[in-house]
């Protein structure tokens, strides 16, 4: 096989792979937090700390963009058998695809990043030096978000949560 024939083969394979990659992105939603969480949403999930039992929870959320452009998300979280806990997020875009946020239960600034249909968040929790790492994936239907969280102490995972969020707007 000549060098030019080999080059043509490689170019055709590369073109096919690029076409397949582009096609796989068609129909996939982009995670824009202020759009995804605008309005009302409901979440159901489970959290487990250390080796303890799994604790079911529900979350009712209401999100809106404020006059200054920041996005506010008010949440009521209920763990089974416990009173409702209210918390509030205030999020803003710092650069394209990058976010900062404050959260009632965080001891410092939360940072986030979007990549296609995924949002990743990281923030320190109040007390004990705990850090929450969350990965939220917007499904292809555009109405469901799957949230996986890992709670870490000194980098060691000590708890996790899984939640399915239904967007009802």
Language-model features: where?
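Bacterial N-terminal signal peptides that target proteins for export
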Residues: 1-11
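Bacterial N-terminal signal peptides
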Residues: 9-19
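Bacterial Sec-dependent signal peptides at the C-terminal "C-region" and cleavage site
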Residues: 18-26
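N-terminal helix-cap/turn-to-beta initiation motif at the start of protein domains
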Residues: 26-40, 140
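Central antiparallel beta-sheet cores of small beta-barrel/beta-sandwich binding domains
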Residues: 27, 31, 44-135
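Short coil/turn motifs at beta-sheet boundaries
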Residues: 34, 54-56, 129, 142, ...
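A short, Trp-centered hydrophobic/proline-enriched beta-strand micro-motif
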Residues: 37-45, 147
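Edge beta-strand at a domain terminus
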Residues: 136-144, 148-169
């Amino acid at each position: 096989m000549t060098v030019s024939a080999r080059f043509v083969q490689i170019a055709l394979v590369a073109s096919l792979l690029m076409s397949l990659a582009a096609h796989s992105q068609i129909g996939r939603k982009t995670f824009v937090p202020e759009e995804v969480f605008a309005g009302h949403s409901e979440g159901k999930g489970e959290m487990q700390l250390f080796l303890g039992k799994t604790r079911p929870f529900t979350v009712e959320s209401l999100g809106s963009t404020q006059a200054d452009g920041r996005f506010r998300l008010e949440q009521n979280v209920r763990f089974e058998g416990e009173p409702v806990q209210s918390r509030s997020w205030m999020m803003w875009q710092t650069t394209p695809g990058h976010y900062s946020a404050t959260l009632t239960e965080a001891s410092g600034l939360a940072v986030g990043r979007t990549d296609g249909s995924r949002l990743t968040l990281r923030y320190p929790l109040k007390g004990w030096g705990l850090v929450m790492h969350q990965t939220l994936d917007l499904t292809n239907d555009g109405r469901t978000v799957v949230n996986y969280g890992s709670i870490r102490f000194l980098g060691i995972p000590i708890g996790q949560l899984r939640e399915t969020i239904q967007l009802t707007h």
